[in-house]
Design a protein with these regions (language model features):
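Membrane-interface micro-motifs in multi-pass membrane enzymes
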Residues: 36, 124-174, 199, 322-356
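Transmembrane alpha-helical segments
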Residues: 105-117, 165-177, 207-215, 288-294, ...
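Intrinsically disordered, polar/acidic, low-complexity terminal segments
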Residues: 5-73, 86-128, 223-224, 366-487
Length: 487
């Protein structure tokens, strides 16, 4: 019976993950575009309406990227996706945003961990599924700012989406390091060019890790250094193309920019704050769940790799803190919630990697003693203590109401209290007005229902605001704004 349960345990964790995603994806049915979704999608939407041609719509998106590169920002691949917002083609397509973002994030985590656990570590398929499911659950269910991270297309794709693609890039890089197949150079270069035009928050640690791997391979005189080196160079050049855009200087002129050394100091300090804030009940519970899995894997692994815990921890902390550098450098702050969200994902991945490494170090020291035990595992009284600790943690999570703050529970509340359906009904009424050809000057009323998770914000109250003018262009109106006077 015990062996049968152990066999099915990975699929139990996978089932919990999948079930927890259902409310989030279902809530996506009531999700609608706003703000920058209309701003960037205006030209492509009109071209699609007038021609129905994918080629001409893509051409309009490329023209938009070229224009924004000169006057606003250099993140070319991110801009391309912004101009191709789902609402440019159909509001129904916008309902799929959450599904796509969650699929990318979960897929990225599973894809990255597969070569690590199945090739570099002697892990089983079940152990890979277990670790991937638990980390995916934590990333999605315990992150704050779910609205910007999973529902608002412009913000979620720019941050969570690109972070997920970064995981796919690293997963492909690790596959190359394992099998040495040069055919992987093509996807690596495509990923590098794409990521170079994305957000700098997830790009910076990716570049640091890629360059570090290349240098280590060069020191070992490993022939794989050439492919990794080419990939790193393309990644750096793509970043340079993005960073040197004239539009960046225009945009940053209105931001509170600080010296680089001060940004580095602030991000190192912020990393400490994040670590204390995010190492909570959920993290400890996950660590206890993963402890026996990590022990099983590590006892099949050569322990020499785990002999430098301080150096490894310091490097991992540097990678983690590097994510905050672009935010402090350009904004002198931790950035918007959607940016903090991907820093949180990175914290989870790195902190559990460090946890895994330190367990390996402890095992290495234990095995170096005279007459070391043949096998170290969580059993007997130690296992009883682990189960007791997990029970206490679960009880604390229930009593403190922490479980109610998970993304799934928030989605369930919005679905069951009728707020989501009421908001969708209001939005559909607004669309009837916006699509009425006889109304050319549109004055909108604010939304009465503003459900958490799917309500990002409304349109401006000034008809001369750039966003108001873009939305008016989108719906082919003379003017458009929201009248907040009665609120």
């Amino acid at each position: 019976m015990k062996n049968n349960f152990a066999k099915w345990k990975p699929y139990f964790f996978l089932a919990i993950l999948l079930l927890s995603l259902i409310p989030l994806i279902w809530l996506g049915r009531y999700n609608y575009p706003t703000g920058d979704d209309y701003y960037y999608g205006a030209e492509t939407h009109l071209v699609w309406q007038q021609t129905g041609s994918i080629i001409q719509t893509l051409d309009a998106a490329c023209a938009g990227v070229a224009d924004s590169y000169q006057i606003w920002q250099g993140t070319y691949s991110a801009l391309f996706l912004m101009y191709l917002a789902p609402n440019a083609f159909s509001n129904t397509a916008y309902h799929l945003v959450t599904f796509v973002i969650l699929l990318l994030l979960c897929g990225g985590i599973f894809y990255l961990l597969c070569p690590l656990f199945r090739r570099f570590l002697p892990g089983t398929c079940g152990e890979w599924i277990t670790v991937s499911s638990i980390l995916s659950f934590l990333c999605i269910q315990t992150v704050e700012f779910q609205c910007d991270s999973f529902y608002w297309y412009n913000g979620s794709m720019y941050y969570t989406g690109f972070f997920a693609v970064t995981l796919f890039f690293l997963g492909t890089l690790f596959r190359y390091l394992d099998n040495g197949k040069r055919i992987l150079l093509l996807p690596l270069l495509l990923f590098a060019v794409f990521l170079g035009g994305g957000n700098y928050v997830s790009l910076l640690p990716c570049m640091l890790l890629s360059v570090t791997i290349t240098l280590l391979l060069l020191l070992q005189k490993n022939k794989k250094a050439y492919i990794c080196g080419i990939t790193s160079v393309v990644l750096l050049l793509s970043f340079a193309v993005s960073a040197m855009a004239p539009g960046n200087h225009v945009r940053q002129s209105g931001m509170w920019k600080i010296p680089a050394w001060k940004a580095i100091a602030k991000c190192l300090l912020q990393g400490i704050r994040y670590t204390f804030a995010w190492t909570g009940l959920w993290w400890v519970l996950a660590a206890l769940l993963l402890l026996p899995v990590f022990l099983r894997i590590l006892q099949k692994k050569n322990g020499a790799f785990f002999s430098h815990p301080i150096l490894f921890t310091g490097y991992a902390y540097g990678l983690f803190c590097s994510m905050s550098c672009p935010l402090f450098y350009t904004m002198n702050s931790t950035g918007p919630g959607r940016a903090v969200a991907i820093v949180y994902y990175m914290f989870l991945l790195i902190s559990f990697t460090v946890f895994f490494y330190w367990i390996g170090f402890v095992l290495l020291k234990m095995q170096a003693r005279p007459n070391p035990p043949e096998r170290i595992e969580v059993s007997g009284k130690l296992n009883t203590a682990r189960y007791l600790a997990m029970a206490v943690l679960l009880f604390s999570i229930l009593c403190t109401g922490l479980w109610q703050e998970t993304s799934a529970m928030k989605a369930i509340r919005v679905l069951t209290d009728g707020e989501a359906a009421a908001y969708a009904a209001e939005y559909e009424d607004r669309l009837l007005l916006l699509n009425d050809p006889e109304v050319t000057d549109v004055v909108l009323t604010p939304f009465i229902h503003q459900p958490a998770l799917i309500y990002t914000g409304d349109l401006p109250g000034d008809p001369e605001d750039p966003t108001s003018r873009k939305v008016a262009q989108y719906f082919q109106k003379t003017s458009l704004y929201v009248n907040y006077g009665n609120n």
